[in-house]
Amino acid sequence: MEPAEHLFRQEAGRLVAILTRLFGVHNLALAEDVVQDAFCRALETWKFHGVPANPSAWLLTTAKNRALEILRREGTARRFAPELGRFLESEWTLAPAVEEQFGTGAIQDGLLRMMFSCVHPRVPEETQVALILHLLCGFGVAETAAAFLKKADAMEKRIGRAKKTLARSRRLFDLSGDDVAERLPAVLRALYLLFNEGYHGASAESAVRADLCAEARRLTSLLLDNPRTATPAAHALAALFCFLAARLPARLDPAGNLTLLGHQDRSSWDAALIAEGRRFLDGSAAGDELTPYHLEAAIAGLHAQAARAEDTDWAAIVSLYDRLMTIQSSPVVALNRAVAIAERDGPARGLEAIACIDDPGRLARYPFYYAALGEFELRLARPGRARRHFRAALALARSPMEKHFLEGRLCDCADVSPAR
């Protein structure tokens, strides 16, 4: 990504959040237009005068001046943010009110309010994540569509419908209200899905989207900076993200191929992120609620503390999966538990655990279900069965990297002699 593109993506969310607070969420399109105008002016100006020492401040000032111009010109013709209306109606209070919205504290507050607005209960879950990516992370419609393997025109319609839903509320979510705790789980879920899209993504270019993982971590840090949203569950989610992000440098080999956890070069794991994850996990211990994020973070933490794959405490991991199944039973969690059982007790026990999964039909389109079956059969020296499962996984692979990995496992089947 070009430096300017990276900067614009980084600043887009902040600017859209600030301007939406000023204009009102019903004028979201206007806020986006002002941001786009600021970026266009930057490209034109910087081309001749060079990039300023503080490009972020330059963009903020440009957007602020444009916002003031619009508010002065259309103050009586258009309805702006209801909660700022009395300040925006007078020239004496207009400039100070706008200036206040561009302060650091107001920017952070605006980003949080926008995040909570994006998970409006009438917006479908996958669209909530797409909306966060689009509005708060600066991803264009085409980029957002690519992240979810959707067509750009379909994603544009989906985002458009979600924006109309937000517009009907006329104002951003109020963080001082009593429904923060009610909507926070949806925010955490959206960030979890965003990170997951990066970590287990199906991009045509890469099986890993570190940029999506980084955005999920950045937005989670905003939650931890606000006392109303810095809950134990938010700390647990931050811990999970840190532990998993620490492994990203080893998740692909130098050729860009997927590397399984057991074969990763653990010396390349990010020790600072692992330490940060431990601090967040400690912070998640407050309170008396045990969430799936706590258990997933604890599992990832056990992997992170194992210096070698053979040092992994699989018994403890199976125990954590057992607890996870009691509060969030799903076929995918059950499959992960089966993999842990296979590591603890051997592949035959792993196959037995898979056979006991409730509603296995929900895994029928999940490539890693067949990949796990193939791995277990290969370890049991049954290459014929393994080959069938790997072929089924290959047919469902979502990216060239996944296909390449599974093709490699198919080739490995030829090197295994059938058990007698």
Locate each region found by the language model.
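Residues within the DNA-recognition helix of helix-turn-helix
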Residues: 11, 158, 389
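Σ70-family region 2.3-2.4 aromatic/basic alpha-helix that recognizes the −10 promoter
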Residues: 36-40, 53-82
